[in-house]
Amino acid sequence: MKKIKLYFASPLFTVMEQWFNRDVVEELRNQIGFLPKSEQVDISIYLPQENEAINDKSAYANSTMIAQADTQELLESDIVLAILDGVTVDAGVASEIGVAYAKGIPVIGLYSDSRQGTHGNVKKIEALDEIAESQFAYINLYTAGLVKLNGVITGNITDFVDTILEDVKKLIEDKLEEVE
């Protein structure tokens, strides 16, 4: 059976992050099951927090164990799903995006910070001239650029999920057309 693998790159250290990751991946797994011809392809989503061999924080895994395990999973993936939210992009997520870019693996990013854009309010632009008054969120432009060069950044969870489902539909068709 043909395989499609998605890699979910996200911060995973707080209860909030773990719940968000679990809920999004669970929703994706459910919706992917309803895609046309999905039963003809083995589709999986790797969520690093589910890999207890390296992410059970009460156990021990050193840096090379984590790097090797997650990199192997990432390199076997067809698409990387990257959560870009946070004060800055999580360092692990940024590293995963770099590996994906270097290997030509497409990335679908989610950057949902509500401080994006002016929402038509000119005072937000004027405030940029005042020290410590920026009304806008910050995202590392290098990391964002790597995603955009090899994928797309969405601004809300609905667009994120819809984009993933569309890409998985295309992958299903491509996999089923492959000659063995």
Briefly describe each language-model feature range.
Residues 1-180:
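Conserved catalytic or regulatory cores that recognize and/or transform ribose-phosphate-containing ligands
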